[in-house]
Amino acid sequence: PNGVVGSEMVAGQKVKQGTLQMAIVTAANAGSFSPCVNVLTFPYLFSGPEDIMGEKGYLRPGSAFREELTKRILADTGSMRLIAVGTNGFRLLFTKKPVTKMGDLKGIKLRLAASPVMQRTWETWGASAYAMAWSETFTAIQQGVMDAFECPTNILLYNGFYPYTNHVAENLYYCPQIFLILVNERWYQKLSPEQKSFLNEAAAINELEHFAWVQAEYDDVRKQLVNHGVEFHDINDVEQWKANAIALWPDFAEMSGGK
């Protein structure tokens, strides 16, 4: 149940220590355990959903990128194994007023996960970015402590944010919300070969089914949000956003254990 084992960061730490067998941690937060995960938050690394989990997707089960990510997470942490990956779609910007150009971000207080890559990206674009736990976000938006946040549209709908942030910058598509299912390595190694095979197979099937479901529901989610009074806008200078963000990649590579 929500909140029983604590926040993502707390749950991830418990998996690392072995006091919890499994946790779901978004890539934006998992970088604190394994720097290589920060690469999943690079702006404009993924050009669309198919790049993530499509037939040739970087994170599709069995891909070379996925295998390398699994190895590096285990090497970095010594105790955390990547068992599954998922995405709820690309992060879009949700605000109290329309944002159609970079200059509109001036003065906006933006809630972010504790990701140095994402924070640097948004500050480069001109927003005032603040790291905040997800559990605190709804109240902060509701009370006006924060003006905006970014997530996939299904989060805006299912978590009831739309009365407070009813404008969406729809064509931003700078970064997907990726989550990792991590298990404690010592616990995993105690499983029988049959149990490991079952777990790995179930995880792979679930990943692809979830990806297909998220893709299929996007239009319906958008329609429901429009019916709730949410307005969708395009950013007019989105190519400038992209250029400014990609220029930061060399700095981000260092944050991810690269060069």
Q: Where do the protein language model's features map onto the residues?
A:
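Signature of the catalytic double-stranded beta-helix
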Residues: 54-70
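N-terminal secretory/targeting leader peptides
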Residues: 1-51, 69, 73-259
